[in-house]
């Protein structure tokens, strides 16, 4: 079952790559140095979570 999932993931990325559009990783999805695309505009890849997140939504503690 894992092999089928991996095949489906690779096929999806290949289809998106051949579509000719600018492909990016949306918020909440996995990212990292092994990915061949970056997070969408306004998002950053947090290394400890390996996910694309928005920097504007970080809650701050009020003391």
From Swiss-Prot:
Expressed by the venom gland. Belongs to the venom Ptu1-like knottin family. One of its GO terms (cellular component) is extracellular region. This is U-reduvitoxin-Pr4a. SUPFAM superfamilies: omega toxin-like. Its main location: secreted. Keywords: Calcium channel impairing toxin, Disulfide bond, Ion channel impairing toxin, Knottin, Neurotoxin, Secreted, Signal, Toxin, Voltage-gated calcium channel impairing toxin. Transmembrane segments: none annotated. It is found in: Secreted. Binds reversibly and blocks P/Q-type voltage-gated calcium channels (Cav). The presence of a 'disulfide through disulfide knot' structurally defines this protein as a knottin. It comes from Platymeris rhadamanthus. Disulfide bonds join 24-40, 31-45, 39-52. Residues 1-19 form the signal peptide. One of its GO terms (molecular function) is calcium channel regulator activity.
């Amino acid at each position: 079952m894992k092999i089928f999932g991996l095949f489906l993931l690779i096929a999806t990325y290949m289809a998106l790559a051949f579509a000719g559009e600018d492909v990016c990783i949306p918020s909440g999805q996995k990212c990292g140095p092994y990915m061949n695309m970056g997070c969408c505009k306004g998002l950053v890849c947090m290394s400890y979570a390996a996910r694309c997140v928005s920097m504007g939504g970080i809650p701050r503690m009020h003391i």
